């Protein structure tokens, strides 16, 4: 959620910044509702002050018959106050709803562009594998090795699900443990295991609601949502809390399954693990001082990159343009890993700074010192990494001519010393 005072004082600037996201994002209704809201509030408070003052005068008079006119006048004032307050409630409800639908303002360092074609390559790492054979897609490799079973998963549940087994299941578990150990031991994150279902307030706090409800799996009676990412429960750990400056930065890492309806993705990545309704992910979440948020984003991105470097998977870092960043983000780096069968890079992690956008929605604040007024923290998060897509990258980049898969050196201790997956 954006700062109302900032928008009010910088309306043209805010509208211009939002325009770089693309689409028609007008703040005209914001201006109208804000003016109505302030006018009604002023009128109500003025009458309340008058009523309090006159009521004190009336209370001092022993013979109430001498102030009948004032008593009658105050009854009329009370009725007007109720009318103003009722109107104010309606206006504020619409105003608050509108605020929840306005996306974050892109950070000044975010490249301006309309779509992913205008994203900027920041850096690349690693050499692309040279193969003396036609590389197979990961689904063919996995089915030949009998480590992923898409057909039975479809029978069990439906499309866009996968059954991992044998070395495939072990490799997925190894990746989760490897990532969590790296982030908690070497990068200093605190490991947490949050609930996989959250309430509406949690989804609203991180920005998934109200705008993206159609993308979520919703349970009823009681109402809960299956999490689309660990970002949601982990960010909400400190919802409605005031932190100490000395506590910052707070860094969490969490493994969770993630659940997404993938609305609007019909026909995209219909085979394999790239786009699933359920997938595993290790997440990185930070709560930081506003002065440190950009530096902390660089650190967090580097921590996600380290996973790919240790697995020796070639990748590149992309700075997303203003038209491609997410609703809540002000700046985002995507990590894209090389997939030989597609002869291209595919996203494996998004690392974002949200400024105080999520903190305002979730009420996450801190104090510079005991006497200071609470301020909003800045939040950041990123995938460290998407486990299924990492498995895809390993299968494709480490495939051999005979269809076997070499296990990356860094994963072998987690695989019981297994060096190769064979038939």
From Swiss-Prot:
Enzyme class: ligase
Amino acids binding ATP: 260-262, 347-350
GO biological process terms, semicolon-separated: selenocysteine biosynthetic process; seryl-tRNA aminoacylation
GO molecular function: ATP binding; serine-tRNA ligase activity
Catalytic activity: tRNA(Ser) + L-serine + ATP = L-seryl-tRNA(Ser) + AMP + diphosphate + H(+); tRNA(Sec) + L-serine + ATP = L-seryl-tRNA(Sec) + AMP + diphosphate + H(+)
Cellular localisation: Cytoplasm
GO cellular component: cytoplasm
Superkingdom of the organism of origin: Bacteria
EC number: 6.1.1.11
Keyword annotations from UniProtKB, A to Z: Aminoacyl-tRNA synthetase, ATP-binding, Cytoplasm, Ligase, Nucleotide-binding, Protein biosynthesis
Major place of residence: cytoplasm
Binding residues for L-serine: 229-231, 283, 383
Pathway: Aminoacyl-tRNA biosynthesis; selenocysteinyl-tRNA(Sec) biosynthesis; L-seryl-tRNA(Sec) from L-serine and tRNA(Sec): step 1/1
Subunit structure, as described in the record: Homodimer. The tRNA molecule binds across the dimer.
Domain remark from Swiss-Prot or TrEMBL: Consists of two distinct domains, a catalytic core and a N-terminal extension that is involved in tRNA binding.
Annotated function: Catalyzes the attachment of serine to tRNA(Ser). Is also able to aminoacylate tRNA(Sec) with serine, to form the misacylated tRNA L-seryl-tRNA(Sec), which will be further converted into selenocysteinyl-tRNA(Sec).
Family per record: Belongs to the class-II aminoacyl-tRNA synthetase family. Type-1 seryl-tRNA synthetase subfamily.
Name of the molecule in the record: Serine--tRNA ligase
Species this chain originates from: Trichlorobacter lovleyi (strain ATCC BAA-1151 / DSM 17278 / SZ) (Geobacter lovleyi)
Gene name tied to this protein: serS
């Amino acid at each position: 959620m954006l700062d109302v005072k900032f928008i009010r004082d910088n309306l043209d600037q805010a509208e211009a910044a939002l325009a770089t996201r693309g689409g028609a994002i007008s703040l005209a209704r914001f201006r109208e509702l804000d003016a109505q809201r302030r006018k009604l509030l002023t009128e109500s408070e003025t009458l309340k002050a008058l009523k309090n003052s006159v009521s004190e005068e009336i209370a001092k008079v022993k013979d109430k018959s001498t102030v009948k006119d004032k008593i009658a006048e105050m009854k009329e004032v009370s009725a007007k106050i109720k009318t103003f307050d009722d109107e104010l409630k309606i206006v504020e409800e619409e105003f608050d709803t509108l605020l929840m639908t306005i996306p974050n303002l892109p950070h000044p360092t975010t490249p301006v562009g309309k779509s992913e074609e205008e994203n900027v390559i920041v850096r690349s790492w690693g050499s692309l594998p040279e193969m003396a054979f036609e590389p197979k897609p990961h689904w063919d490799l996995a089915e030949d090795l009998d480590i992923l079973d898409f057909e039975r998963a479809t029978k069990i549940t439906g499309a866009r699900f996968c059954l991992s087994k044998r070395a495939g299941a072990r490799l997925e578990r190894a990746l989760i443990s490897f990532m969590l150990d790296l982030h908690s031991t070497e990068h200093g994150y605190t490991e947490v295991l949050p609930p996989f279902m959250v309430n509406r307030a949690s989804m609203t706090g991180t920005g998934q609601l109200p705008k993206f409800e159609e993308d979520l799996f919703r349970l009823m009676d009681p109402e809960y949502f299956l999490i689309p990412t660990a970002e949601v429960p982990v960010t909400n750990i400190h919802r409605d809390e005031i932190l100490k400056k000395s506590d910052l930065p707070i860094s969490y890492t969490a493994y969770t399954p993630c659940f997404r309806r993938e609305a609007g993705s019909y026909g995209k990545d219909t085979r394999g693990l790239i786009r699933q309704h359920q997938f595993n992910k290790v997440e990185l979440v930070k709560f930081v001082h506003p002065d440190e948020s950009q530096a902390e984003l660089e650190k967090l991105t580097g921590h996600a990159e380290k996973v790919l470097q240790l697995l020796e998977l070639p990748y590149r870092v992309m700075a997303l343009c203003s038209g491609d960043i997410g609703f809540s983000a002000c700046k985002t780096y995507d990590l894209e890993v090389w997939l030989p069968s597609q002869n291209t890079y595919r996203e494996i992690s998004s690392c974002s700074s949200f400024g105080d956008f999520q903190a305002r929605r979730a009420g996450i604040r801190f104090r510079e010192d005991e006497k200071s007024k609470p301020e909003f923290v800045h939040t950041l998060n990123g995938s460290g990494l998407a486990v299924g897509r990492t498995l895809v990258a390993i299968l494709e980049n480490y495939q051999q001519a005979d269809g076997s898969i070499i296990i990356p050196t860094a994963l072998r201790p987690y695989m019981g010393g297994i060096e190769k997956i064979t038939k």
